């Protein structure tokens, strides 16, 4: 009986050891990817913040009617959701999906969705939520190529009045253990009051450059979301894999203890049987 128990525990020890090797390797890979993602995030964040300042000045000094500021009359809302292509990253994806569901549940008829990432597409399909477009297999370091494709699609949907508001839903990265889901409205722009002592002259007139300015701003904004999303994904995966490795270590300690106790019990029983047999021979 003890022998069968020892064999079962030995199998479990082997299984947990193999799992620990996988989680440890994935944790190391995620750590390396996170380091690269954080460098990319810092670079993109500087560019994005500077472009926001420039755009703010441009928007505030546009006096002519413009659909990108005044709206286009459509009541449809577009949500662009940033999720991951791979799993095993804790609650990273489900937190984003839950926030989207809470946003659209009050007005499903006027809510449209573009999803980025295999996992987001899978969750939305299970929930019966249709998507306007899907973008998958985004590289670990996203480029302007991916951002431009999405930006052009957003501009097309907005300028054709298929959507009247555009929101980006992504995970803002603060640290490997802290990320926050944000819902950022990017269209139409919010115009602020002009400063009385500030005057900017644009040449050529800014209205002639509006389409180019809009596309560049959307590219910068989408790249910023990509960078935050990739850093958050890898931070969540690193934390999840490190936690899984720690749990595997604890489980192995318990299994080793059970194995040693069972083996000791088997040895004690065997010695008792030998002694008992010897006594019977007398």
Curated annotation (Swiss-Prot):
GO cellular component: plasma membrane; proton-transporting ATP synthase complex
Listed InterPro entries: ATP_synth_F1_ATPase_gsu (IPR035968), ATP_synth_F1_gsu (IPR000131), ATP_synth_F1_gsu_CS (IPR023632)
Principal localisation: membrane
Localization terms from the record: Cell membrane
Swiss-Prot/TrEMBL GO biological process terms: proton motive force-driven plasma membrane ATP synthesis
PROSITE patterns to which the protein is assigned, alphabetical: ATPASE_GAMMA
Gene Ontology molecular function terms on file: ATP binding; proton-transporting ATP synthase activity, rotational mechanism
The protein's assembly and partners: F-type ATPases have 2 components, CF(1) - the catalytic core - and CF(0) - the membrane proton channel. CF(1) has five subunits: alpha(3), beta(3), gamma(1), delta(1), epsilon(1). CF(0) has three main subunits: a, b and c.
Role played: Produces ATP from ADP in the presence of a proton gradient across the membrane. The gamma chain is believed to be important in regulating ATPase activity and the flow of protons through the CF(0) complex.
Family designation: Belongs to the ATPase gamma chain family.
Protein name: ATP synthase gamma chain
Organism this protein belongs to: Clostridium botulinum (strain Kyoto / Type A2)
Name of encoding gene: atpG
């Amino acid at each position: 009986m003890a022998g069968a128990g020892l064999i079962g525990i030995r199998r479990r020890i082997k299984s947990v050891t193999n799992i620990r090797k996988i989680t440890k390797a994935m944790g190391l890979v995620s750590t390396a990817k996170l380091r690269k993602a954080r460098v990319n995030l810092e670079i993109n964040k500087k560019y994005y913040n500077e472009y926001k300042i420039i755009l703010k000045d441009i928007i505030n000094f546009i006096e002519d009617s413009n659909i990108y500021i005044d709206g286009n009359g459509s009541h449809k809302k577009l949500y662009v959701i940033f999720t991951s292509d791979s799993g095993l990253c804790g609650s990273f994806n489900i937190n984003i999906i839950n926030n989207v569901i809470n946003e659209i549940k009050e007005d499903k008829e006027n809510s449209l969705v573009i999803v980025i990432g295999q996992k987001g597409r899978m969750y939305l399909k299970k929930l019966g939520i249709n998507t306007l477009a899907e973008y998958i297999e985004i590289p670990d370091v996203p480029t302007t190529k991916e951002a431009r494709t999405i930006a052009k699609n957003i501009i097309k949907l907005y300028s054709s009045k298929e959507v009247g508001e555009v929101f980006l839903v992504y995970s803002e990265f603060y640290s490997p253990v802290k990320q926050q889901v944000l819902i950022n409205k990017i269209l139409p722009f919010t115009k602020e009051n002009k400063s009385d002592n500030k005057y900017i002259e644009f040449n050529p007139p800014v209205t002639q450059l509006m389409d180019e300015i809009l596309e560049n701003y959307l590219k910068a904004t989408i790249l910023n979301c990509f960078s935050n999303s990739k850093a958050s994904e890898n931070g969540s995966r690193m934390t999840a894999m490190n936690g899984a490795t720690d749990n595997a270590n604890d489980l192995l300690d318990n299994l080793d203890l059970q194995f040693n106790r069972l083996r000791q019990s088997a040895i004690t029983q065997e010695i008792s049987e030998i002694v008992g047999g010897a006594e019977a021979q007398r």
